[in-house]
Amino acid sequence: MWDPDVYLAFADHRGRPFYDLVSRIGAKRARRVVDLGCGPGNLTRYLARRWPEAIIEAWDSSPQMVAAARERGIDATTGDLRTWKPKPDTDVVISSAALHWVPEHADLMVQWATELPHGSWIAVQVPGNFETPSHAVVRALARREPYAKLMRDIPFRVGAVVGSPASYAGLLMDAGCKVDAWETTYLHQLTGKNPVLEWITGTALVPVRERLDDVSWEQFRQELIPLLDDAYPPRSDGTTMFPFRRLFIVAEVGGARRSADVS
C-alpha cells in the first residue's frame, strides 16, 4: 500500500526531476495534459499553471495516491497505466517516476507515439539506480530468514529494469519522434534520522511492507539501518549524501519528419 504522507516526506527532492523534465517540453499551448503516475497530485497542480487552458487528466494505480490527489483538487483516476489510451485532444503526456514499475514500458512509449496526434509531446522520467546499495541491501536482507519464505515471490527489480537514454531515443526516433534524452545523477543531501531508510520506505520498500506484519516490518527496518549506514555514512554535520541516477526522455511526436521536411 502506497502512503502519500511517507512519499511526500522528501517532496522537494523528488520534485526536482519532475520540473527538470517538464521544462524541456516545447508545447506552448495544450488542450489536454495527462499525468500518468500522478502520485498524491502535488506536482500535477503545476501542470495546470504551465498550461492554464488545458484539461488536466491524471492517473495512478494506487487508490491511496488517487485519494490524496483528489484532495488537492486533481481529477484523478485509479487505473493501470498499461490500459491508458490517449483521447484525440491529448497534446502532452507526462510520466515521472512511474513507468519503471511496468516491465514493457518501452513498448508503451512507442505505442503512445503511434496513437498521439502529430505535434504532441511525450515526457518520461525513470530512476536508474536499481543496482545501488539502497536496492541491493533490501534484496539481500529479503533473501534471509525469517523473511525469505514471506517474500520469495516478490519481483524485486534487478538487472535491466530500465534502458539507456540512447535505447529509448532510438525506439522513439524510429517511431518518427524528435527526441531529447539524457541522464543525470542527483546528489541529494538528506538530513534527519536514518534518511535513506525513510526515503526507500516510501518507494522501494512498499512491496516489502505489504508482506510483513507490524512486528516483522519493524524488525526488517531495524536490520536495514546498519546496512544503509555502511553504504551511505552520515557526515559529521548531520547530512547524508544520497546519489540518485535518473533518465529523461522527451519526444515530440512527428517531430523527426517535420525536421526532415524543413531541412
UniProtKB/Swiss-Prot annotation:
The organism's place on the tree of life at top rank: Bacteria
GO cellular component: cytoplasm
Chain ranges passing through the membrane: none
GO MF, any single term: trans-aconitate 2-methyltransferase activity
EC number: 2.1.1.144
Localization in the cell: Cytoplasm
Recorded family membership: Belongs to the methyltransferase superfamily. Tam family.
Keyword S-adenosyl-L-methionine attached: yes
Keywords associated with the record: Cytoplasm, Methyltransferase, S-adenosyl-L-methionine, Transferase
SUPFAM superfamilies xrefs: S-adenosyl-L-methionine-dependent methyltransferases (SSF53335)
Its job: Catalyzes the S-adenosylmethionine monomethyl esterification of trans-aconitate.
Keyword S-adenosyl-L-methionine: yes
Protein name, entry field: Trans-aconitate 2-methyltransferase
GO BP: methylation
Catalytic activity: trans-aconitate + S-adenosyl-L-methionine = (E)-3-(methoxycarbonyl)pent-2-enedioate + S-adenosyl-L-homocysteine
Chief site of localization: cytoplasm
